[in-house]
Amino acid sequence: MALIEAPSELTMLKRYCDNDDIRIEANDVSAVQFLSERRQPFVVGAAINCYNPQTLKQFVDLGMTRWVMPVELSRDWLVNMLNGCDELGIRDRFEVEVTGYGYLPLAYSARCFTARSENRAKDDCELCCLKYPNGRLTESQEGQAVFVLNGIQTQSGSVPISLTIYRRCKGWWTWCG
């Protein structure tokens, strides 16, 4: 969950954090706080926008076991980030996840586009998003895919063609694609 603002969302987040049978991907710092207070391991999702090794170290110290790299950053940036983590002595304390395929998350909104399109309040949406498992496509006047609106998230209108794969090889991340 990103942009937690409604009381119902905070209640749901607390309920998820109280379940220690699953590992939570935190996409809002409030989830990091709840999980670290409970001493539960967690994943820092791409929506937290972590861009430097010092911040990663703080999250590792709070219980992070995996970090999802922000989708807008490059291979070279990732290599530099991981080298910085090696210098801080934390690289072996977490896994790295890289988004390689799918609609790219571009922005989050306080309003739920899906609920609004059906004239429903965000807190009383009756899970209308389940009718649209792939989101709602928006097109340009020329009929080209522009965005996919999926709940509170605006995503890219098409899936990038290239898929870049990284692997860990003798302590270094290398490009394999």
Features from the language model and the residues they span:
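Active-site pocket-lining/capping segments in soluble small-molecule metabolic enzymes
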Residues: 1-50, 54, 73-177
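Conserved functional loop/turn residues at catalytic and ligand-binding sites
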Residues: 63
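Conserved glycine-bearing catalytic or ligand-binding loops at nucleotide- and phosphate-handling centers
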Residues: 66
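Short beta-strand and adjacent tight-turn residues that come in two discontinuous sequence segments
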Residues: 69
